[in-house]
Regions:
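Secreted/periplasmic proteins
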Residues: 1-89
């Protein structure tokens, strides 16, 4: 399950948070890892770069920036079932 977020000044990697960038938070993947996130409800995908830590809510595997959430059309629901594929690091 993925969620999205839009608040914050600085990410755990030290980068300034940009809600429109194609970025995400993951608990264990190294910063800079590129991940294809696919919304299982509609098949839409986005490639994001991991630059933060989280999510810290049980059952969620990734937190997307607002911009990335918009690409896979999950902002209305707030959360969506997703699949993750590491595509680069």
């Amino acid at each position: 399950m993925a969620s999205y977020y839009w608040q914050g000044q600085q990410t755990a990697s030290g980068a300034r948070f940009n809600p429109n960038a194609m970025t995400a938070a993951h608990r264990t993947l190294p910063f800079g890892t590129k991940v294809r996130v696919t919304n299982k409800r509609n098949g839409r995908s986005v490639i994001v770069t991991i630059n933060d830590r989280g999510p810290f809510i049980r059952g969620r595997v990734i937190d997307l920036s607002s911009g990335a959430a918009g690409v896979i059309d999950m902002k209305g629901a707030g959360v969506a079932p997703v699949s993750l594929e590491v595509v680069g690091g």
